[in-house]
Amino acid sequence: MAETLPGSGDSGPGTASLGPGVAETGTRRLSELRVIDLRAELKKRNLDTGGNKSVLMERLKKAVKEEGQDPDEIGIELEATSKKSAKRCVKGLKMEEEGTEDNGLEDDSRDGQEDMEASLENLQNMGMMDMSVLDETEVANSSAPDFGEDGTDGLLDSFCDSKEYVAAQLRQLPAQPPEHAVDGEGFKNTLETSSLNFKVTPDIEESLLEPENEKILDILGETCKSEPVKEESSELEQPFAQDTSSVGPDRKLAEEEDLFDSAHPEEGDLDLASESTAHAQSSKADSLLAVVKREPAEQPGDGERTDCEPVGLEPAVEQSSAASELAEASSEELAEAPTEAPSPEARDSKEDGRKFDFDACNEVPPAPKESSTSEGADQKMSSFKEEKDIKPIIKDEKGRVGSGSGRNLWVSGLSSTTRATDLKNLFSKYGKVVGAKVVTNARSPGARCYGFVTMSTSDEATKCISHLHRTELHGRMISVEKAKNEPAGKKLSDRKECEVKKEKLSSVDRHHSVEIKIEKTVIKKEEKIEKKEEKKPEDIKKEEKDQDELKPGPTNRSRVTKSGSRGMERTVVMDKSKGEPVISVKTTSRSKERSSKSQDRKSESKEKRDILSFDKIKEQRERERQRQREREIRETERRREREQREREQRLEAFHERKEKARLQRERLQLECQRQRLERERMERERLERERMRVERERRKEQERIHREREELRRQQEQLRYEQERRPGRRPYDLDRRDDAYWPEGKRVAMEDRYRADFPRPDHRFHDFDHRDRGQYQDHAIDRREGSRPMMGDHRDGQHYGDDRHGHGGPPERHGRDSRDGWGGYGSDKRLSEGRGLPPPPRGGRDWGEHNQRLEEHQARAWQGAMDAGAASREHARWQGGERGLSGPSGPGHMASRGGVAGRGGFAQGGHSQGHVVPGGGLEGGGVASQDRGSRVPHPHPHPPPYPHFTRRY
């Protein structure tokens, strides 16, 4: 195996007593060594003993080379085991007397583990798919030291005279391979001693020794009896070991057989040849006891092997060869030289057996009719006594099979990195793990890996399934299922293989009849368990087919037929009343009945079940069809509902899209409308603002017009007022015009007086208005009154000349003073009345010049004739004349004039030719003059600008 746990290689208490000189050493070629020898050599060197024969041979060759020996010639020990076995038996007796209890426990744990070893070794060496064990881990000691098979032969020879020793030997022999050479007397003794443990009647001896039996066995050759029986012998081994309370050596022998069991699959049919010679020498009692004792250990192995079949393997042939080779192990070591001689033939037969692998697994062939017929005859003679012997063992084995079958778990979907230790750690959370292995297909290394785990109880296995099925391990989803037992496939392939070798194996001993019966009982139990686990419709169909095949008659009875792919089997059982074999197809409830009822009642009930099974099969088929129809109907209904839902969803989505588009359009329309309304509102607001602005402007315009109208009205009022005041003095003025005092000659004098200061053109009198003549005289009187003493200070008339600068009149026409004076006079008059009137026209200039002359003339006439009131009246009278004046001496000119400082005087503060004297600063009624002061003492400081004005009148 891949891992050998500590202690597996120890000899144990039984071997401790062996003398060192017991074994004799011989030299054999490496290619001649069997797997068991290879493993023994590897174990001596503390090397790994796992793998098939080629791997072991390669490993051993490498080790031998490292030791410096010839790898082709290797020295191995050929043990002479007579003393060894004797000591072992004595030791076994002593230990039995001590009655140690832990043997049962160890057997328990070893039981499942041994099953696993056997089954997985078969798995490992499958002919079809070459399943190989990647990794394994086991709880109990898995293998025992290699004991020579010679010792098993010598045991009986040396101890058959003593019944006590024979009893002890019989307790231990079942653990050893069942083939031993015994003489007739020894056989009788062993039969007698076997009655200590089993109810074997003396008749069995006679029936077994009948010559008829020998003929039958010769006919049968080796067909399908010895190998399955040996296989079952391993299954029956453990309960018997417990019953007899055999301690250390006994257990070690069982482990040794396990080692053989695991080793022999590689050797295949090579060992069948030597088995025939061994069988000729072996005793029937030994075979019976070995069968009884080995049976339960193999049963779980069958389950394991069937569990491996899902990987696509064909374990049947390999299992059969494993079982047969298990039995042959001792005889081969006993007669190694004879074994080697027929080995080529054996290999040929092995190849032939492999050729039939597919047939064995896939169909139920009618080939073994001959063997089954002879086997039936064989059974007639031996069945009655054997049944009595086997029943207690069957019950015990039934319990063990029931418990052991459910303990094996098949784990699929493992990661390639998963090791057996990982599986063991994982499954040990939910119970005790007896053993765990990881297998894969050796031919395709990248293939999927599978795990095989054996728990201590089926309850723990169930718990593991419930907790670990469909869980994740190393990134992969694992499936945990109970392992299914399909032993019948193995039997079928055994039969085919045995038929191929019938000629070579014809010298089989009489003990086969006993083996056949026990084998059948074991097969029935295995089939019951298997039926419980996999009663499927396909199995039922196959079973029906098998039954049709079986019905023709008792000659066509096969011991066990199985559909390799389905797992339904038939069993041949001896009917006591008729003395002939009866074929029955088992159902799930058979195990309980077998333990409580007699054999004939069992066969009757089985026949009834055969009849019932057709109806049941039909019902099952009908139910299956009905379920299928219902499933299809439900599926159709679900599909229809799903399509309806999808249609509705599509329609709903379409309507939603349509509605959404409509809402979007409406939203756009509303948005456009809102924008239009907004634009209209803004337009309205703009128009409103415009209207208000126009309204304001209109109002302002109206106010302005109103103000102008008021101004005009006020001016008209003022004019009317002045005109109303003026007519009171107009008669005086008019009269004065005609006055004799206004002669032309007077003007000559005035002109003469002011000729330097007032040069005038000839047309100076053209625009003279005689109507206004009187006002100048009043004004002149007013001025003359206050300014006569100081001419330079009081010549007011000289200060009104600024107006003429404004309207651009030529300065040469008049004197500067007269221009300034009259302009200033008009401006001052306007200022005093608070009205901004346009400056006086040009005509006012002549009036001003003429007025000066009038003033001077009248000043001489009337000194101080007028008072201040007359001056104010003069202002009002002159207003009308100045109203028509226009020009630049308007508001700005008016604003620059000074105000009146005292009584009647006019201050000139505007812009003049020379120095500026502000009019506001004058006091005491004097009129400030800009350029008059120097003119009085010098009346003519400058030459007259116009010479033609210099003439005097």
From Swiss-Prot:
- Where is the cross-link described as Glycyl lysine isopeptide (Lys-Gly) (interchain with G-Cter in SUMO1)? 65
Q: Which residues carry this modification: Omega-N-methylarginine?
A: 897, 903
Placement of covalent cross-link Glycyl lysine isopeptide (Lys-Gly) (interchain with G-Cter in SUMO2): 65, 94, 188, 199, 380, 385, 388, 391, 395, 517, 524-525, 541-542, 551, 578, 586, 608, 616
Domain SAP: residue ranges: 30-64
Localized where?
Cytoplasm; Nucleus
Motif Nuclear localization signal located where? 713-730
- Modified-residue entries (Phosphoserine), positions: 54, 109, 158, 207, 507, 513, 787, 832, 886
> GO terms for molecular function, please?
identical protein binding; RNA binding; sequence-specific DNA binding
Origin superkingdom: Eukaryota
SMART domains to which the protein is assigned, alphabetical: RRM, SAP
**A Pfam family per the record:** RRM_1
Region Interaction with SAFB1: list its residue ranges.
600-953
Task: Tell me which GO cellular component terms the UniProt record holds.
Answer: cytoplasm; extracellular exosome; intracellular membrane-bounded organelle; nuclear body; nucleoplasm; nucleus
Q: Name its GO BP terms in alphabetical order.
A: regulation of androgen receptor signaling pathway; regulation of mRNA processing; regulation of transcription by RNA polymerase II; Sertoli cell differentiation
CDD domains in UniProt? RRM_SAFB1_SAFB2 (cd12679)
* Bias kind Gly residues: ranges: 881-890, 899-927
Bias (Low complexity) ranges = 318-329
Biased composition of type Polar residues is found at: 274-285, 370-382, 555-564
Q: Where is the composition biased (Acidic residues)?
A: 98-114
Give residue numbers for the modification (Phosphothreonine). Answer: 201
Regions of biased composition (Basic and acidic residues) lie at: 224-233, 292-308, 345-358, 383-400, 525-551, 567-579, 590-665, 684-820, 843-859
Region named Disordered: 1-29, 91-114, 219-404, 525-665, 684-953
Q: Where is the RRM domain?
A: 407-485
Q: What is its biological role?
A: Binds to scaffold/matrix attachment region (S/MAR) DNA. Can function as an estrogen receptor corepressor and can also inhibit cell proliferation.
Assembly and oligomerization = Interacts with SAFB/SAFB1 and SCAM1. Interacts with isoform 2 SRPK1 and inhibits its activity.
Protein name, per record: Scaffold attachment factor B2
Q: Which organism is it from?
A: Homo sapiens (Human)
Upper taxonomic classification of the species? Eukaryota, Metazoa, Chordata, Craniata, Vertebrata
Point out the gene that encodes the protein: SAFB2
